[in-house]
């Protein structure tokens, strides 16, 4: 009906508006462990309802991040929700500092892999493989990481696991 089309179009326009207006990050120093634990708590109901478990593993001690905590929380919640929607049962967030002093955060899940065709498109605004999706989550997340002079990429997706990597330089 016209009403449904109108609602869909409004949703699209709102999504586009949100995508094009990412606020400049308000950065401060914080320990990543606290943020990871908050993300796990914020997504707990959704993970439990789907039979999944989300955990945090600190591979380097006391990972201190200088970033916009709210924006990074938004990225991680999006990645956890995507994992749940991909029918993951195990979702793991890890953080480490590499030899170049970059902070590497991985979000790994054992859900359905992302098809080779979709891997090329998942960061394109409004691309979605989901019935209810808007296709802005990953695009917005990548934009936020760029504003942090970092990157967000899909580093692996096969029958065993899917891994998204955030790198803070």
What are these regions (language model features)?
Residues 1-22, 29-46:
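Conserved DHp (HisKA) dimerization/phosphotransfer helix of two-component histidine kinases, i.e.
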Residues 22-25, 64-67, 129:
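Conserved micro-motifs of the catalytic ATP-binding
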Residues 53-63:
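Conserved catalytic submotifs in the C-terminal HATPase_c
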Residues 90-101:
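Short beta-strand/loop element within the Bergerat-fold HATPase_c
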Residues 114-126:
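Short conserved segment of the HATPase_c
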Residues 137, 141:
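Short alpha-helical Gxxx[C/S/T] motif in the catalytic ATP-binding
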Residues 145-146:
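Detector for a conserved hydrophobic position within an alpha-helical segment of the HATPase_c
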């Amino acid at each position: 009906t016209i009403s449904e089309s109108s609602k869909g179009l409004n949703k699209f326009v709102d999504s586009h508006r949100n995508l094009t207006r990412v606020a400049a990050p308000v950065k401060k120093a914080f320990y990543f462990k606290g943020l990871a634990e908050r993300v796990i708590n914020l997504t707990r109901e959704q993970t439990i309802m789907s039979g999944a478990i989300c955990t945090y593993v600190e591979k380097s001690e006391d990972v201190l991040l200088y970033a916009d905590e709210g924006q990074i929380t938004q990225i991680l919640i999006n990645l956890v929700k995507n994992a749940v929607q991909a029918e993951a049962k195990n979702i793991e967030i890890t953080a480490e500092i590499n030899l170049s002093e970059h902070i590497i955060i991985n979000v790994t899940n054992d859900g359905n892999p992302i098809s080779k065709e979709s891997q090329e498109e998942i960061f394109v605004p409004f691309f979605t493989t989901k019935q209810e999706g808007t296709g802005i989550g990953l695009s917005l997340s990548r934009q936020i990481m760029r504003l942090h002079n970092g990157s967000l990429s899909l580093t692996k997706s096969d029958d065993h696991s899917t891994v998204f990597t955030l790198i803070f330089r």
